Amino acid sequence: MTVDALLPLLSEDRAFYDNSGGGITLFGGECLLQADFCAALLKACKAAGLRTAVDTCGDVPRAAFDKVMPYTDRFLYDLKAIDEDVHIAATGRSNRRILENLRYIDACGKAFEVRYPFVPDYNADQAEKIAAFVKTLSRCVGVKVLPYHNLAGSKYAALGMKNTLPAALPTAAEVAAAQKLFE
């Protein structure tokens, strides 16, 4: 699909965006792996007067951010851990670039919301560290604690794969305590 084909479809909901204060959010997998297309689409959306956001895990080259930054009003930024060893244990990848890119977004003056997936037995101990890190940034407009759920378990079974996801779900009290750290 092309930008020219997408823009009329996205513009159909303009009244909803205007009434809700919303706009176009690019997400799915890691949309910034397609930074050139994202930049072209965001540029067209801005030219059409639409508000824009990008949902990202931040583990992409800085050049991807440079391409979309001029056309992005807000970033939704996943932050799983501050401690590199915790991040590597869960994802197999370092979080250095993720943290550097979030600092970069902040330095560029762009608004962002941190989204913290809260997973017992993985990163529950990271909430205070994430809160302390976020407080060093000036453009954060909020933090959402996203409680872990095990809905993917049935998908593993259907695919005949071993489910390696944690079994424990966070309690409402644990989630509330984590969210309180960000107030």
Give the location of each predicted region.
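A structural motif corresponding to the C-terminal lobe/cap of the Radical SAM core domain
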Residues: 141, 157-180
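FAD-binding FR-type
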Residues: 1-5
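Conserved AdoMet/S-adenosylmethionine-binding subsite of the radical SAM
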Residues: 7, 11-151, 155-157
